[in-house]
Amino acid sequence: LLEISKSKPTLICDADEVIFDFMYSFEKYLHAKSLYFNWKSYALEGNILNNKNEALNKSQITDTINNFFMHETESMSLVEGAANSLKILSKQNSIIILSNIPFKFYEKRKVALKKNGINFPFFANTGPKGKAVKYLSDIHKGKIWFIDDSPYQIKSVKLEEKNVNTILFVGNSKLEALIKSKNKYCDHFSNKWEDNIKTILN
């Protein structure tokens, strides 16, 4: 049973691209398989190409993602400043990690978090995160922060619970360049963990 402190704000934090440097590790993995990411949009579909410049289909993308998580989850590098920032924020906030990693790789992600000294409650989710965040906000009743790199997840949360304070955090400059409306749904936009600290502790 998850126990959330009623006396502290709760910070719900994504993992890939927020804690773990997903695209850096994923691109290295793709190159080793004679594949590459072409950075045309904020999506996987249509962006993973083979050495003949042919886009992988949905089934091939699923296989590629699953193989990546199978072999690389425990060794992915961290986003700069993530671990130390969470440690600082945990002094005044209850932290929950909510990731859309496929459920079958949940234990591998737990190992990776522990290996990097990130010891907070961790939950795997599928699809939009709005309902999960709404559930947690109903338990907590206090101030809630939500950090994610996906505008779609920020929108999902705002549609379910408008009082959640949202940060769209995109530390990867290539991904940031693909976002057309950074402040359309989020309360704050950030590309550095030090800015997240300032915003949350302000």
Predicted regions and their residues:
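Glycine-rich phosphate-binding loop signature in dinucleotide/nucleotide-binding domains
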Residues: 5-7, 91-93, 137-144
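Substrate-recognition "cap/lid" segment bordering the active-site pocket of phosphatases
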Residues: 102-145, 151-159
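Substrate-recognition element of Asp-dependent hydrolases with the DxDx(T/V) motif
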Residues: 73-77, 82-112, 122-125
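Active-site neighborhood of HAD-like aspartate-dependent phosphohydrolases
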Residues: 1-63
